[in-house]
Amino acid sequence: MASSRPPGLIQCYREELQARHYARRTVDTYEQWLRRFLRFHGLRHPREMGNEQVNMFLTHLAVEGQVSASTQNQALAALLFLYRGFQ
């Protein structure tokens, strides 16, 4: 008999976005930003991180990634949902 694992962070994050009727493309985009944020910080759990790590990530996007302000805002929105609307 196979044991069922509880859903992981990313799956729960997606499900919460979907439950709040976010568009499919928004859900996909937010998931990608969450994955990039987690990889940037060595796959640490978001509970172990906070404002400082979010700011580090956004600064990295602006300086190293040379992304536009609107792209930074999109990443910030995904992380705000993680920290304010999800956990």
PLM regions and their residue ranges:
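Intrinsically disordered, low-complexity and often Lys/Arg-enriched segments
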Residues: 1-7
